[in-house]
């Protein structure tokens, strides 16, 4: 699913949202998540999963063109860990829909 497909789904699910408002909501959420991760914070969405950072230590690599050894510096990369409900749902074992899919749940 692409970002534009996510925006379209959000607009379909909530008819009171104009497509432009749904796009703004998705962009705002993604910006907030990006900002939090860039500051080293962890993001947890219960029932869905968590986003965090994994540290990749410095290492000696090899330039594929010249074969020369190069020092690759330490870096942090974003990482997603799915929650139990999402893992079970993807695996097909969960009998109940996620709370966000429950039309009777008016949060």
Swiss-Prot record:
Cellular component per GO, a single term: cytosol
Bias type Basic and acidic residues, positions: 82-101
Disulphide-bridged cysteine pairs: none
InterPro entries per UniProt: Hist_DNA-bd, IHF-like_DNA-bd_dom_sf, IHF_beta
Molecular-function annotations in GO: DNA binding; structural constituent of chromatin
Record-linked Pfam families: Bac_DNA_binding
Gene3D superfamilies, per the entry: IHF-like DNA-binding proteins
Matches recorded under SMART domains: BHL
Region of interest (Disordered), ranges: 56-107
SUPFAM superfamilies: IHF-like DNA-binding proteins
First and last residue of the signal peptide: none
Listed CDD domains: IHF_B (cd13836)
Keywords: DNA recombination, DNA-binding, Transcription, Transcription regulation, Translation regulation
Keyword Cytoplasm attributed: no
Statement: the UniProt record of this protein carries the keyword Transcription: yes
GO BP terms: DNA recombination; regulation of DNA-templated transcription; regulation of translation
Family affiliation: Belongs to the bacterial histone-like protein family.
Quaternary structure note: Heterodimer of an alpha and a beta chain.
Record's function text: This protein is one of the two subunits of integration host factor, a specific DNA-binding protein that functions in genetic recombination as well as in transcriptional and translational control.
PANTHER family according to UniProt: DNA-BINDING PROTEIN HU, INTEGRATION HOST FACTOR SUBUNIT BETA
Official protein name in the record: Integration host factor subunit beta
């Amino acid at each position: 699913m692409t970002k534009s497909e996510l925006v379209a789904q959000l607009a379909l699910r909530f008819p009171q949202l104009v497509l432009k408002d749904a796009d703004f909501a998705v962009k705002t959420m993604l910006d907030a998540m990006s900002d939090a991760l860039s500051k080293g914070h962890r993001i947890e969405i219960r029932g869905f999963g968590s986003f965090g950072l994994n540290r990749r230590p410095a290492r000696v690599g090899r330039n594929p063109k010249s074969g020369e050894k190069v020092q690759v510096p330490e870096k942090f990369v974003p990482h997603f860990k799915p929650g139990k409900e999402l893992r079970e749902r993807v695996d097909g074992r969960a009998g109940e829909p996620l709370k966000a899919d429950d039309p009777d749940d008016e949060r």
